[in-house]
Amino acid sequence: SIQASETFNGHTYALTSAAMTWAQAKVIATALGGYLTTINTKAENDWLTAIFRIPYGHSWIGANDIATTNTWVWDNGTTDNDNGLTDNICGSNGCPNSNATWADNITRKWNNGEPNYSGGSCGYIWKTSGTWDDVACSNNKYAIIEFD
């Protein structure tokens, strides 16, 4: 189930009421008619970080490369015309020089050197910085669910 529902730019966001795996979060999001959040702009990322990070810690977002390793996409299927979340220069050593940008031409929020593929195919947002990292999908975290 969900808690802490908030609205930004015409979309509603809710946080799961418990920490869970990425797959469990995806099932709940789908059952509720939503999806794990797709972050389209720096403003949205900053807002999500401010609203959800302090009380709940690191939280799952929709970023993943489950279907194809090194090809990051969003849970709702969008790819943003840039191989999802990176600028196509990712390799087995991660994306240390990724300069992929949002629609507002501001560099995406991957933490430096991330995603680094150290056993992680699911993305989460860091509670302190709002940057993203990849980690094993079997970890337990709260999840941010987005509704159109």
PLM feature segments, named:
Residues 1-148:
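Extracellular, disulfide-bonded carbohydrate-recognition/adhesion ectodomains
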